[in-house]
Curated annotation (Swiss-Prot):
Belongs to the SEC16 family. Residues 489-501, 610-627, 793-805, 830-844, 1686-1696, 1747-1761 have a biased composition (Low complexity). This is COPII coat assembly protein sec16. The keyword Electron transport does not apply. Residues 461-470, 1591-1613 have a biased composition (Basic and acidic residues). Residues 23-45, 73-91, 128-154, 165-194, 283-304, 412-426, 662-671, 737-753, 1456-1465, 1503-1521, 1528-1540, 1547-1559 have a biased composition (Polar residues). Keywords: Autophagy, Endoplasmic reticulum, ER-Golgi transport, Membrane, Protein transport, Transport. It is a peripheral membrane protein. It comes from Aspergillus terreus (strain NIH 2624 / FGSC A1156).
Length: 1806
């Protein structure tokens, strides 16, 4: 006890944080602490600064430096260590005699701090000896002590003094304390371990480490011990000065004899307390080791009698000084044997140990090793939390360190810490003891045997001898390393780690221990020599013991000690970088101690860069090779091969062959890692290549490092191996990175190259194994990455047999990285794999700089092109139907005399046509979709297709895109369920309820588990956890129990007739049956409340998922809307979590989990239908939709039978496409083809299969058109044509046009069908079958025929043809007339095409006006509105069209323009408008422009107002447009010849004029007319005559056709196109020309000619529509000559007119959509939505705004102002023939047109 206490007092790590000197008893009490605590204590000891009391803090750095030098001294340091050891044994006796040694007690420590300065010298020696002795017996404690001593030698001395001062009587007691404290150490040092040999030595260290860990005070003291290195510093615990002297004395003894080191420890423990001080003083250069020796002494002496004996031996040795140690290894061996025999630790044979020590001392390399070791130890101290003790391993590892030399013992602790712990044996056995401290904790038992072992000396010699270093993988010393290997044959190179018996191997033993806690200490020791600074950053890895052992074994075998000089005490911090230390090629092992590698770092790096370099490159290459990326470039031993093979290329410091040989194992790890980023290095060339290819992925090694973190043990194992090289990896800059500290960085280097996170695990593992060398190579580029990489990859052969070593560490490491494998394994890896597609290696590009050839420039001016397009460039054009035309230029070389290189002549290449499906194959389902679904015969094919799709969804799983959704799995299942329900719907002809088979089918789909038990009494909700088993938490039976008092109160309430009180009394008493019976006779609200209360208190409180049952009860009670609150409470929907304070139930689960009960709720509702349950399902669907559960929501909508199918722009639409979320993801609707096809199947099942003649989802027609385009692009033109025909048939069959049947849709269908006819072989058949299609879509020929004949051929176009048909016949003769009729008709393309040429010509003439018109509106949409303007100027549809049409109609319109009908038709109206506009350019432009602006406005304002504005404008324009023929003919009256002039007066004009005329009197019209006449005098005259004639005729015709017109007007109100056409008829007959213009603005269908209700109002001076009173107010068209003035007013009126919706409808008839527009107009506000959702805009667009747009742009605002009167005239302004005629004349302007107008005037006059 006393001895242990003394040791604790001597060892700052054991001292209490308060620095009070603990009593021996206290120390003993602390000793029982677990190894983890010991480790912690060591960790604390490692950090000198933390403790104020710790002497280390006070100790100046000089002392620390002084401590390190002993390592460099071969004989003297060893002797010092021996002296310390000897002295420690003496203190052991002394401790036994002197209880005061109990310094561990905090209070004692405080006293000691005060007393130590006085007594440190006297008692310090004794204590030192005792502590050393104790340390030896207490192998576990010894490591800590050694570390503490290294860091706190002075403190220890002081502490001893204080201890002695405070407790002189406990001098004898120390034995027991040591026995207690150092029992472990005693076992390690005292008995079996110390005599055992190197392994014993490490065991001793291990034992010592444990004691240190045990006492918390010791831990704090250990931290203090770190400062002990500075004698000058005095810690509160004990005076530093005295202790320093004691330590010096102790070191002196150690210097005298290597073997006497331990003797001195013992002796000093008993008698020569002053010696330890003296030794410590002498070894001020290596105070760390001395301090460790001192701490070792006390633990050993206390540990056991054997330890005492050993202390005695050490005391003798101490008296003999360290020289004695070096002089007599036999004595040391004897001491060790005695100690080991007493100690439990595995003792290394004394003979072995002595021989090893002797060899170590004899070796010239000892000094080098000492230096390295000294550097390594300090580095380790810095590197590890408990490294301080390791840094001073002389005490802990003094057994081996002493025999070797002062430097050697230090090296041993280092090697012990880094390498031996990494061995699997050590790692397995020692990890628990707190490897964090380092070797001290991990190898206390081993340390005891090691001190006697000369393995350290061998390590030194090995350090010098890279060859020998290879031999000893366990310790830095060569001898130790080799014997270690021999002993640990099972480990090829890591044998040291496996065999702990030998002294050198003992070092390996500690590493395993350290691997668990501190892999860095051992590794750190080796790499510390090379890269001490890097190690500190990697203190994290200090906990990993394996790295330290590896450095030892590796340094000993390779030139690890060679870097010894470099491995000054600073090296210790690098231990974390031991792998980084790899840079020193020879010292792969020494890479652990960066010292060895530092010298070679630069060289290794250079070697890596230049594999040819034999020597320096060899070492780095060895490191590289050892690193998982040992390049095949370097051979095993030879310097030249070493760069390539990268096996331990000897560092410049050591012989090349030995290092190469040794380094082959370790060098591969560090050397390659650090050195071979540029140059491939691997154990094998293949491995190297793999590494090289993957080197760019070093960054990825971090992941590998993370992986290695999981296998911290493997890292340690690797460290045991030559990992030391990995431990110290050299960065290209020559800096050693401490891979060990990094955790497993070195291991990653060897274990695996950077991993590709995307690579398959199998491949990654194999690749990492094969590419491990590569891991090392990349580090040179970046040391940290290399380190990380090292961590992941198995250790490439650190030694000759890297695989064995790697395996050994793996075995020792609990967590084995699959990548960690022998270097041979990695080397064998095939480069191919390394370059696997998953490999992270950067893609290799086999590219050669293209030769720059000179082009021959052209001489025709193209050479001036700044883009130099004359050089030629590939041209690719995507055409219709999936056709692709490509043309690549030809570069023809031209050779000329005297020119070495040819010049290139660019010439066009061959144009080739390809099919898109050949370039981009389109995956089609096994069963082709049978669409379009036209009849019941498709049912079977549809079911087969649905089944195939369902199977596909089930087999393919969740798509990558769907996985982005947080609930992708549930949504996938719900999608499959939706498809299955649609299949059932198709199977049962659109029925989902009623019959038992349907219920059974639904049950099998919604609740598959019930299908097996169809007779189950449970409903759909059965999947809910058996409700029958659910019972209220408060026992429902009790709640229903009869309470006499409650029943009495209930009866009393009922006697009084107060049923309400009776109900609530029953509720309060939980008499639910009574409450419900009474509530059933009361108001419904009471019943609902009672049920709600019942659900809340009984159902919701029950265990299990009762949400669906609660919802069902709510539905039964009539709480339909509130039923969903049972699934997701309102608070949860608001984002809050409510907790009930009544029932005391907290939120047992997520409130949103109730959404998952939707299926149960649906099943319960379907099996228990109630009157309003469909509303509940609708609410449930909306709830699900709000949370993004689209498929589930649509299922509920389908069963609710109340869902609204509509366009995306319809806010009331519940479903646009089944399975598509139009609310949250509207942009995806058009991209999901499956959603459209599924919706088409639903439409087919609910309409055709249900008995309806046609499909009834109007909004789906637009999607069908899109699908047809998609099919055409795929080359499936026949199917696309079928869809076009189906759309046409649907449009034709409907008697009530929908807003979705807009003109965009019509034009789109016509455009697509026209293209398909032109590009398909069966076009003839298409033409034959086209008539109906043409009527619907506006086929050119069909429209022309209808226009000429006046038939209502355009049924689908809603009678637009009618409006112009009357006029059509007559106007068909005129070029302008056909255009007008065409324009009026939704289908006008045919006619328009005929008139298109003239109109286009006029368009050019009137470009200004036309241009202006489009500018007012959207370029695409506006043109249509213009025509519409004339056709249906006031129709909101037009506005709607503009909005909705933008996306849809615009493109089709453009396309249609290209189509002859479209083009002809569109230009016509715009041209006339333009001419009208031109005639009234100035004034009309402004007003009309507003009108145009209005059309854009329509979407927001509504179609009605827009139509009016447009109507006015459009009517003026369309009036112009309808007049356009007239205008085309000339601004003079001649335009009427086209009937366009006349058309404006038609009913179409009436509608618009109503709005516009209402806003503005006829003045506007006269102004326009005047303007137009002013523009053209002839036109003015003609206009005047025409005005009179038209007025007269209009009055007559209006009267005659009033009745007919009224009927037609009513029809037109529904179908605007019809009215417009009717206006054409009146225009044709005479006074009705204005109506014709109106018709031109409106659909052709309206045949208002015969029934023209227009009459000429003399007061208004315009034609007035009798049926439309508002038209009388609109006088815009009255004065044709003042067109300029009139148009502005009209425009203004049009602007004001927008409000009227009625007028829009009249124009609407021109385009079928108008009627539908009535509803859509609000939607028109949104142009895009209108495509699908707002049909009205499409309708407006039907006039083909595109062509109009083309024409419109030319139109000027002023000219457009002219046209507005015409639109007004066409509907409302039509009453004024003059207005009608005037605008056309103005537009026509041309003489030819004038002639035509004249003809027309004549007709009108007649």
């Amino acid at each position: 006890m006393a001895a242990s206490e003394q040791f604790a007092s001597w060892n700052p790590a054991l001292r209490s944080e308060d620095h009070s000197i603990p009593t021996i008893e206290n120390t003993l009490d602390q000793q029982p602490t677990s190894p983890a605590e010991q480790v912690e204590s060591q960790a604390k000891t490692v950090t000198p600064p933390p403790q104020e009391d710790s002497p280390l803090q006070e100790v100046p750095e000089d002392v620390v430096d002084t401590v390190v030098p002993p390592v460099s001294g071969d004989t003297q340091p060893i002797a010092n260590a021996l002296d310390q050891d000897q002295t420690q044994p003496q203190p052991e006796e002394t401790d036994r005699d002197i209880p005061p040694m109990i310094v561990d007690t905090p209070k004692d420590t405080q006293e000691t701090q005060e007393s130590v300065p006085r007594n440190a010298t006297d008692e310090g020696n004794v204590f030192s000896l005792e502590s050393n002795d104790s340390a030896f017996p207490t192998t576990q404690n010894a490591p800590d002590l050694s570390w503490a001593e290294d860091s706190q030698p002075q403190a220890v001395e002081r502490h001893d003094d204080s201890v002695w001062t405070l407790h002189q009587q406990s001098k004898e007691t120390p034995t027991s304390p040591n026995g207690d404290f150092g029992t472990t150490s005693h076992d390690l040092w005292g008995s079996p371990t110390s005599p055992g040999g190197e392994h014993d030595f490490f065991d001793q260290l291990k034992t010592q480490t444990k004691p240190i860990y045990v006492p918390p005070e010791s831990e704090s003291r250990y931290e203090e011990g770190v400062p002990l290195l500075d004698e000058g510093v005095s810690s509160p615990t004990e005076p530093t000065a005295n202790q320093e002297s004691r330590i010096d004395q102790i070191f002196d003894g150690d210097e005298d004899e290597e073997g006497a080191f331990f003797n001195e420890v013992q002796e000093s423990a008993s008698t020569d307390e002053s010696r330890p001080y003296g030794h410590m003083t002498r070894k001020s250069t290596s105070q760390v080791l001395d301090s460790l020796d001192t701490s070792m002494k006390s633990p050993v002496s206390d540990a056991s009698p054997t330890a005492r004996e050993f202390d005695n031996i050490l005391a003798a040795a101490a008296s003999g000084n360290q020289v004695k140690k070096s002089t007599s290894e036999e004595d040391l061996a004897a001491r060790w044997q005695a100690e080991l025999s007493d100690e439990e630790p595995e003792p290394a044979p004394e003979d072995d140990l002595a021989a090893r020590w002797q060899a170590e001392l004899d070796d010239d390399d000892d000094m080098l090793l000492e230096d390295e070791t000294s550097g390594e130890l300090p580095n380790q101290e810095m590197h590890m939390n408990g490294i301080a003790s390791q840094a001073a391993p002389p005490v802990l590892s003094s057994p081996f360190g002493t025999p070797e030399s002062a430097a050697r013992p230090k090296a041993q602790p280092t090697s012990y810490t880094p390498h031996q712990p990494s061995t699997s044996d050590l790692l397995q056995g020692i990890p628990a003891q707190g490897y964090a401290q380092g070797n001290t904790t991990t190898a206390p038992n081993y340390f005891a045997p090691q001190p006697p072992k000369p393995a350290t000396s061998r390590a030194e010699s090995f350090a010098e001898r890279s060859k020998e270093g290879y031999k000893s993988p366990y310790d830095l010393p060569e001898d130790l390393a080799r014997p270690r290997r021999a002993a640990a044959t099972h480990r090829p190179v890591v044998v040291p780690g496996n065999n702990m018996a030998p002294g050198p191997p003992a070092a390996s033993v500690p590493p395993p221990q350290r691997a668990p806690s501190m892999p860095t200490p051992p590794m750190a020791t080796l790499p510390s020599t090379t890269t001490a600074p890097p190690a500190p950053p990697k203190n994290f890895y200090e906990e990993l013991p394996p790295p330290p052992p590896k450095p030892q074994s590796r340094p000993s075998s390779s030139g690890r000690y060679t870097p010894g000089p470099a491995s000054s005490h600073p090296v210790l911090p690098p231990p974390s970088n031991p792998y980084a230390a790899v840079p020193p090629p020879p010292t792969v092992d020494s890479s652990i101690p960066p010292h060895l590698h530092q010298p070679e770092k630069t060289d290794p790096y250079v070697n890596l860069l230049a594999p040819s370099a034999p020597s320096a490159p060899s070492a780095p290459s060895a490191a590289s090779r050892y690193s998982p990326k040992p390049p095949s470039l370097q051979g095993g031993v030879k310097p030249p091969p070493s760069p390539r093979y990268s096996p331990a290329p000897p560092p410049s410091t050591a012989p090349v062959p030995p290092r190469n040989r040794y380094a082959s194992q370790p060098s591969s790890g560090p050397g390659q890692t650090a050195v071979l980023p540029f140059q491939p290095r691997t154990s094998s060339p293949l491995a190297y290549h793999e590494k090289v290819s993957y080197q760019p992925q070093e960054g990825l090694r971090k992941p590998s490092f993370a992986e290695q973190e999981s296998a911290a043990g493997p890292q340690n194992e690797i460290q045991e191996q030559p990992v030391g090289h990995h431990v110290g990896q050299s960065v290209p800059g020559g800096t050693v990175v401490d891979t060990q500290n990094t955790g497993a960085p070195m291991a990653p280097q060897q274990t695996s190259p950077p991993r590709n996170p995307y690579a398959p695990p199998a491949y990654v593992n194999d690749f990492s194994k094969r590419v491990a060398p590569m891991t090392s190579a990349p580090p040179p580029a970046s040391a940290p990455p290399a380190t990380e990489t090292q961590f992941m990859p198995p250790r490439r052969s650190q030694t000759q047999s890297p695989s064995q070593q790697v395996l050994g560490p793996r075995l020792s490491v609990p967590a084995v990285d699959p990548l960690q494998r022998p270097a041979s394994v990695h080397g064998s890896g095939s480069p191919t794999k390394s370059s696997s597609p998953y490999a992270p290696s950067a893609p290799a590009h086999n590219r050669v700089a293209s030769q720059q050839l000179e082009f021959i420039p052209p001489t025709d001016g193209q050479e001036l092109d700044p883009l130099e397009r004359w050089r030629g460039a590939p041209i690719v054009k995507f055409g219709f139907g999936g056709a692709i035309v490509s043309c690549f230029p030809k570069h023809i070389p031209r050779y000329t005399a005297g020119q070495p290189a040819p010049k290139i002549m660019a010439a066009p290449g061959e144009a080739r046509i390809h099919q898109l499906r050949d370039w981009v194959p389109i995956a089609d389902s096994i069963v082709q979709h049978p669409g379009p679904l036209k009849n019941k015969s498709k049912k079977k094919d549809l079911l087969a297709w649905l089944s195939s799709k369902i199977a596909q969804f089930e087999n393919e799983g969740i798509s990558e895109a769907a996985q982005l959704h947080p609930e992708s799995g549930m949504r996938h299942d719900e999608k499959i369920l939706l498809w299955k329900i649609i299949r059932i719907l198709v199977e049962h002809d659109g029925t989902l309820e009623g019959s038992e088979p349907i219920k059974k089918a639904l049950r099998g789909v919604i609740f598959p588990h019930l299908a097996e038990n169809p007779d189950s009494s449970e409903s759909y909700g059965a999947n809910v956890p058996s409700f029958g088993d659910i019972k209220p938490l408060d026992a429902p039976s009790k709640s229903d129990a009869m309470d006499p008092q409650a029943i009495g109160n209930l009866r009393n309430y009922l006697l009084l007739g107060d049923r309400e009180k009776a109900v609530w009394s029953a509720v309060d008493n939980r008499l639910w049956g009574h409450a419900m019976v009474i509530a059933s006779t009361m108001d419904k609200s009471v019943w609902k409340q009672v049920v709600q209360e019942f659900v809340r208190r009984e159902v919701r409180s029950a265990t299990g998922n009762t949400e669906s049952l609660a919802a069902l009860y709510e539905i039964f009670a009539g709480n339909v809307e509130e039923s969903i609150d049972e699934l997701v409470p309102p608070s949860a929907r608001a984002g809050m979590q409510m907790i009930s304070t009544v029932d005391g139930h907290g939120p047992a689960k997520n409130a949103l989990d109730g959404l998952n009960s939707w299926r149960d709720t649906l099943g319960l509702v379907l099996n228990n239908r109630s009157p309003d349950d469909h509303q509940a399902l609708l609410s449930l669907g909306r709830l699900l939709l709000s949370y993004g559960r689209v498929e589930a929501a649509h299922i509920c909508f389908i069963f609710s039978r109340a869902a609204v199918f509509g366009g995306a722009d319809d806010p009331q639409s519940c479903i646009v496409l089944l399975g598509a979320d139009h609310q949250h993801l509207p942009s995806t609707i058009l991209q999901d083809e499956d959603a459209f096809l599924l919706t088409e199947a639903y439409e087919y099942a609910t309409t055709i299969l249900a008995g309806a003649p046609m499909a009834t989802l109007p909004h789906l027609l637009a999607f069908k058109l899109l699908h047809a385009w998609s099919l055409a692009d795929r080359g499936r033109k026949a199917e696309a044509q079928q869809y076009c025909d189906a759309i046409a048939a649907s449009l034709k069959s409907t008697t009530k046009p929908s807003g979705y049947h807009n003109q965009h849709l019509l034009f789109g269908v016509d455009e697509l069908s026209a293209r398909l006819r032109q590009t398909t072989n069966d076009g003839g058949s298409s033409w034959i079958s086209k008539p109906s299609m043409e009527k619907v879509s506006g086929s050119m020929w069909a429209k022309f025929n209808s226009f000429v004949a006046g038939d209502d051929s355009d049924a689908a176009s809603t009678g637009s043809g009618k409006a112009g048909e009357g006029d059509v016949g007559p106007f068909a003769r005129f070029t302008g007339t056909p255009t007008l009729s065409l324009f009026l008709a939704a289908d006008p393309p045919v006619t328009s095409q005929i008139t298109n040429m003239p109109l286009m010509h006029l368009l050019n003439n009137l470009a200004d006006g036309l241009r202006w018109t489009p500018s007012a509106h959207h370029p695409m949409d506006f043109p249509f509105p213009q025509r519409r303007g004339s056709q249906e100027p006031a129709t909101p549809m037009e506005n709607t069209f503009y909005q909705g049409g933008g996306p849809y109609g615009s493109p089709p319109a453009v396309g249609y323009q290209s189509t002859p009908p479209q083009t002809s038709y569109m230009p016509l109206a715009p041209v006339e408008e333009d001419s009208a506009t031109q005639s009234y350019p100035a004034a009309s432009a402004p007003p009309h422009e507003p009108a145009m602006n209005t059309s854009p406005y329509l979407p927001p304002g509504g179609p009605s107002s827009q139509p009016l504005n447009r109507g006015s404008m459009m009517d003026s324009q369309t009036g112009a447009s309808s007049y356009m023929p007239a205008e085309t003919s000339g601004s003079s009256y001649t335009p009427p010849t086209f009937n366009t002039g006349y058309e404006p007066p038609t009913i179409e004009t009436t509608a618009a004029p109503d709005t516009q005329s209402t806003d503005e009197p006829a003045d506007d019209v006269p102004l326009k007319k005047k303007k137009s006449f002013m523009d053209d005098d002839d036109d003015d005259d003609i206009a005047a005559r025409a005005a009179a004639l038209q007025k007269a005729e209009k009055e007559r015709k209006d009267r005659e056709a009033e009745e007919n017109f009224r009927r037609i007007a009513e029809a037109e109100a529904k179908n605007a196109p019809q009215q417009k056409k009717s206006s054409w008829w009146p225009g044709w007959f005479g006074g009705g020309k204005k109506e014709e213009n109106n018709n031109s603005g409106g659909p052709i269908r309206a045949k208002l000619g015969e029934e023209n209700s227009f009459y000429y109002d003399k007061e208004l001076k315009k034609w007035v529509n009798k049926k439309d009173p508002n038209s009388a107010t609109v006088s815009r068209g009255t004065p044709p000559p003042p067109r300029g003035a009139a148009p502005p007013s009209r425009t203004a009126s049009g602007s004001s007119a927008p409000p009227p919706a009625a007028s829009p409808k009249p124009p609407g008839p021109d385009s079928r959509p108008t009627s539908s527009a009535g509803a859509p107009p609000p939607q028109t506000g949104s142009p895009a939505p209108s495509l699908l959702g707002a049909p009205p805009p499409f309708l407006n667009a039907v006039p083909r705004s595109v062509s109009t747009g083309a024409a419109a742009p030319p139109t000027r605002p002023g000219s457009s102002s002219g046209p507005p009167p015409r639109p007004a005239t066409s509907l409302s302004t039509a009453s004024s023939i003059d207005d009608l005629l005037g605008p056309p004349q103005a537009r026509k302007g041309g003489t030819v047109k004038g002639k035509k107008k004249g003809r027309y005037v004549d007709v009108m006059a007649k």
